[in-house]
Amino acid sequence: MKKIFFGLFIFSGIFSDAQIIRKYSNEFLNIGAGARGLAMGGAVISNQNDVYSPMWNPAGLIDIDRDWQGAAMHAEYFESIAKYDYIAFAKPLDNNGGVFAISVVRLGVDNILNTTQMIDSEGNIDYDKISSFSQSDYAALLSYAFRPGSHRLSVGVNAKLVYRNVGKFASGYGFGFDLGVLYNADNGVNYGAMLRDATTTVNFWTVNQDELSAVVNGEEFNPAPKDKMEITMPKLNLGISKNFEINRDLELQPEAGLNIDFTKTAAVISTDFASITPYAGAELKFQDMIFVRVGVNRFQNITDIESLKRKVSFQPSAGIGIKYQGLTLDYAITNSGIGGSNFYSNFFSLKLDMGDFRN
């Protein structure tokens, strides 16, 4: 039953006859990657400096200066109904000091019940006609980071290719670009900015009308949408952080910032022009070996179903990490942030840094 409702949610989001510009188009690319960043509530816009950077701020790749890095992450949502995976590789380029990276992201839901053929043209129900299908979102990111003259300033760019598939019903291709900037000030403060979908990201859909639609008693259900193109508008993430040395063994790095969506949403600050959501997170590091992290984000105004009163919800997160030489294992846990939901998701990620192994 859960997968039936999940499938209906997917259909309503993808095949609706809404405007071409949709609020949650390619939303899977906003999840992030790496249990470190997810445990800190996304508070890594100005301090993520490894192979996970393309998903947060590609300018952070510039700190990979010795050898290549590889990473992988796996997570499951809604009691394992949805599965999210990430794999990436990054390497500095010897000729000009820049860093190149390639990342692949997948979010998929398998075994969704297909009931489009359950009722025949005369209105008779045949449960044997129920089948199943999978819905998957894929993205490949090609990233490049460089320093445009100043050693304190770095710039990064993502080129994104998106492929989305909804069983036999529809598939779509999209492309777009992200732009990131990092600045490390003299006083140790780090400033970061990430403009997602900087030129807008465009998806072109192909719909299989024969598989999607159903005719019952002469009336057509699930007609193909009129618009075959959807546009993802830019989003701006801003962050500021600083690393504090508590003593010889302990360091604390907090970050705070704003996520700005150029459309009207349920964010705590929302106008017709933009919606602004604050976030914050911190990492406590012991001897660069053990890490404890917390974060909070996704503040939004919601209506309580029982009392019908307006209130603010948010998404807390936490996690730990352990590092040995060039191998880092991270874990994060977070909930959906919807009305105090008890649905928690677990994230595991593994990073290999050959620069640490060989030095």
Predicted segment positions?
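Sec/Tat signal peptide C-region and signal peptidase I cleavage site
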Residues: 14-18
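Subset of outer-membrane beta-barrel
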Residues: 19-359
